[in-house]
Design a protein with these regions (language model features):
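Glycine-rich phosphate/pyrophosphate-binding loop shared by adenosine-nucleotide-utilizing enzymes
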Residues: 3-5, 64-68, 163
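A short beta-loop-alpha structural element at the N-terminal edge
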Residues: 4-18
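Conserved GNAT-fold acetyl-CoA-binding loop/helix
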Residues: 19-46
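Acetyl-CoA-dependent GNAT
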Residues: 37-83, 87-93, 110, 171-174
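A short, internal acetyl-CoA/4′-phosphopantetheine-binding micro-motif in the GNAT/acyltransferase core
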Residues: 87-95, 123-128
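Conserved acetyl-CoA-binding loop-helix of GNAT-fold acetyltransferases
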Residues: 96-112, 135-139
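Conserved GNAT acetyl-CoA-binding A-motif
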Residues: 111-136
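Conserved catalytic-core motifs of GNAT/GCN5-like acyltransferases
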Residues: 122-124, 138, 142-161, 173-174, ...
Length: 200
C-alpha cells in the first residue's frame, strides 16, 4: 500500500462510498449480524444520527476511501454517557495494511476530547475459521489494547450456524467522582484539530 492514509470526518453524503465497503461484510461475513445490505438512504440516516453526538471518520488513500470507523451509544440512559460502542470496517483489499489501526487510533483521540472514558467493542466470534468468520477482529482489538470482559454463547445466527459474541473494553480516561459531561463531536472538533493530525 503506497501513499499516506489521511483521516477525515465523514459526512452523510459519503453514504454510498461507505456502503461499498460495508456491503461485502453483510453479504460474505458474520462480522456483522446484519442480513440485508441497507439502502443508501438508510445508511445516510445512520450517519446523520451518529454525527448528532459522536465522531464518524474515514480513511482516505490517494483520494479513495479505504475504511471508516465510528462509535454509537452504549446504552440510552444518561448514566452510560461516558461509554460508547465502537465500530470499524476496512476495504477488502486494504486489510492488514494498518488502516484499521490508524482509524481506531484517531477514533480514540476523538473520544478523549469528547470526554468518553470507556470504549466497548461487540465482536462476533467463532472458535474456528468457517469461511465467514475468524479471530482477526478479536486479535485486532487485543492488539489495540482492549481486554475481553465477557462472552455470550451462540447468540447470533447467520449463514445457517450460530456465533458467539465477545465484549471487549478499553478504558481511555479517568473515572472521577464529579465527572465532566460529555461533549458532542462538533463541540470537541476545534480541540481535536488543534491537538491531533486529523484532517477533519
Amino acid at each position: 500500500m503506497n501513499g499516506e492514509v489521511i483521516i477525515k470526518a465523514v459526512r452523510p453524503d459519503d453514504a454510498e462510498e461507505l456502503l461499498e465497503i460495508y456491503a461485502p461484510y453483510v453479504l460474505k461475513t458474520a462480522i456483522t449480524f446484519e442480513y440485508q445490505v441497507p439502502t443508501a438512504e438508510e445508511f445516510h440516516a445512520r450517519i446523520s444520527d451518529t454525527l448528532k453526538k459522536y465522531a464518524y471518520i474515514k480513511a482516505v488513500l490517494d483520494g479513495e476511501t479505504v475504511g471508516y470507523a465510528y462509535v454509537g451509544t452504549f446504552h440510552d440512559r444518561p448514566a452510560y454517557d461516558w461509554a460508547v460502542e465502537t465500530t470499524v470496517y476496512v476495504k477488502e483489499n486494504c486489510r492488514k495494511c494498518g488502516v484499521g489501526k490508524k482509524l481506531y487510533t484517531a477514533l480514540e483521540q476523538c473520544m478523549k476530547e469528547q470526554g468518553i472514558l470507556n470504549m466497548n467493542a461487540c465482536i462476533a466470534y467463532a472458535d474456528e475459521d468457517d469461511g465467514h468468520l475468524n479471530s482477526n477482529s478479536l486479535d485486532f482489538h487485543n492488539h489495540m489494547g482492549y481486554r475481553t470482559v465477557g462472552r455470550f454463547y451462540k447468540c447470533g445466527y447467520k449463514f445457517s450456524r450460530w456465533y458467539d459474541m465477545v465484549w471487549a473494553e478499553k478504558i481511555i480516561g479517568e473515572h472521577m467522582e464529579n465527572q465532566p459531561p460529555v461533549r458532542t463531536f462538533f463541540e470537541a472538533l476545534p480541540d481535536i484539530r488543534k491537538k491531533y493530525n486529523i484532517c477533519l
